[in-house]
Structure formats: C-alpha cells, structure tokens
Amino acid sequence: MKEGNVVQHHGLYRSEFEHDNCGIGAIVNIKGQKSHDTVANALKIVENLEHRAGKDAEGKTGDGVGILLQVSHRFFSKVCKPLGIFLGSERDYGVGMFFFPQDELKRNQAKKIFEVIVKNEGMNFLGWREVPVKADVLGSRAVECMPCIMQGFIERPKKVKQGLDFDRRLYVVRRVFEQSSDDTYVASLSSRTIVYKGMFLVKQLRMFFEDLQNPDYESAIAVVHSRFS
C-alpha cells in the first residue's frame, strides 16, 4: 500500500525511488543471553509490518511471514524426550524444518529418503517430531495448500566439530535430499538456527506455531520477514 503524503525532495531523498517492498526486522541480545522475550518481541515487530506484507483479495492469506531463531536446547530437549528422541548436549544435534506433502504415502517415502541420505553421509538420524499448529487461524487458500510440517533431528558425529563444521555436513544432506525429493520443502537444517514460516498474515505467525508461544523457547537472536510480492 502507498501513503498519500510523500515528501517529494528533502536532502538526498528522491520520491521517484520510493516503492513497496518486503518488511524485515531483527533483535539481538549483545551479551548472547537467550530468553523468550527475544522471540516475543520479534513477533511484535513482524506484527507491526502489515504495511510491508502482501495478502490475497480476501485479506485472509498472506504472501508469507517467517522468523529465524537460534535452536533452543531447553525447548527441544523437553518436547523431544516424550517422543523417545534423546538429543544429548546443546549443538550436538541438528534440526530440520520440513514441509512434507499431506499424502501419507508420499510423505513416508520422502522421510525414508531423508533418513537414508543421513546414514549415507555417516550420521545418525534421531527421529521425527510433528510440529503442533493451529490451522483454523489460516485463510482458505493457505489451508488448501498447507503441508504436513515436521522436524527431523540428526546427531552430530563425534569426529565432526560443533558449529560451522557440523552445519556444513548438514548442508550437504539438505542439498542431496532436495535433489531427491520434489514434494518436500526444507525451510532450514542446522545445529544453530531454525526457521518457522508460512503463507501467513503478519498476526498469524504467532498463533499458528504453538512452539513460538512456549515460554521455554529461548533465543538470543531473532530475524523476521514479511513478504510483499
């Protein structure tokens, strides 16, 4: 959307370069201290970027909204334990965010392909977690194409260093998988960061992903993006 009152010329500003664009924002704790406040405040930022977010004619489905956070060991260790997934220490595992097809057969095939690739790359696959979501907050178009959203966990090999070295190995896994499965989208795969995203209005991101509302989810950094296509 465009505002009616635009300054024509002031200093180096030139109105002819004014145009609609995506919205971005970021929060960083300079001491590296993780907290849920960082997550909550980043969500407030993106919720105030409605003027930088596209939507359909009905006004119920957005062009896309997302948030990048650090992998919260406190959160994932708690939610994975009841599933029989034991993660070990912080940064000793990678987390992937997968958008699988709703068709069960295709989904199971894609999951199996990923597990085989992880094994072939010399790593141990720990298990799957279905991400809890609230589909009733979405618009009809988003519901029609909504994937099955799952997280996959990979153990860090002892011979691979934490951080960048491990993430490089995970990147290879991701690229091989993306060439092997046309029906699945990998939003992120890392031991350090994770991405939550979808075809949301800006206020739907927080409501859709229950993980983002959990006070145990902590991060020292957060980057948000609202898409204006």
Features from the language model and the residues they span:
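N-terminal segments that mediate ammonia production and transfer
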Residues: 1-229
